[in-house]
A protein has these predicted regions:
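Alpha-helical packing segments of well-folded alpha/beta enzyme cores
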Residues: 63-67, 71, 96, 119
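Acidic, serine/threonine/proline-rich low-complexity intrinsically disordered regions
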Residues: 54-59, 105-112
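A contiguous, mid-protein "functional segment" used to position or interact
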Residues: 111-138
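GST superfamily/GST-like fold recognition
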Residues: 81-106, 123
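Structural signal for well-ordered, non-membrane alpha-helices
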Residues: 40, 68-72, 124
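Acidic/histidine-enriched, glycine/proline-rich intrinsically disordered or flexible terminal extensions
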Residues: 136-152
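Surface-exposed helix-capping loop/turn segments at secondary-structure junctions
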Residues: 73-84, 128-133
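GST-like domain detector, emphasizing the conserved glutathione-binding G-site
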Residues: 1-66, 76-79
Length: 152
């Protein structure tokens, strides 16, 4: 939950994820509500049309274009959504943009969203992402446990 993330970062924010930037808190909250209520709903129906009996997954895909364009416009001003470095807002949104792209990479990559794609690919190609998204073999209860430190 975003409330838990905010609480944790108010307690300890070593990477300045709560930095002030071009957006005020009301604007940030509005973006997160749009992500939670609209974008994710349409993403699920685009990604899993059979689960939702959706006959037109492209309809739900296209409903998210307005949000993607809005993010692209924000990224024209910075390398991140709110300030010059990635912040809580970026980390809250990036996984869902990645999921959206993964449904149809060719279609997504053909979109005229230069800044959004640059932002996404910089994250996907980062050491930070590689360290947290490392692939492991299917867990077997008889194997030695794997411990990670998620350092990057």
């Amino acid at each position: 939950s975003i409330d838990i993330i905010k609480w944790a970062l108010k307690t300890n924010d070593p990477k300045n994820w709560l930095a002030e930037g071009q957006l005020n808190q009301i604007e940030i909250d509005k973006i997160l509500i749009t992500l939670e209520c609209d974008f994710k709903k349409n993403l699920d129906r685009y990604k899993y049309p059979n689960k939702y009996d959706s006959n037109n997954k492209d309809f739900h895909r296209d409903k998210n274009l307005k949000f993607l364009n809005y993010l692209n416009d924000l990224l024209k001003k910075n390398n991140a959504l709110n300030c010059p470095h990635l912040s809580m807002l970026d980390y809250a949104i990036l996984p869902f943009i990645r999921q959206f792209r993964n449904v149809d990479e060719l279609w997504f990559d053909a979109l005229d969203l230069i800044f959004l794609k640059k932002w996404l690919f910089q994250f996907i190609d980062s050491n930070e992402f590689s360290s947290i998204m490392k692939k492991y073999n299917l867990w077997d209860p008889n194997q030695t446990p794997i411990y990670t430190n998620f350092s990057y």
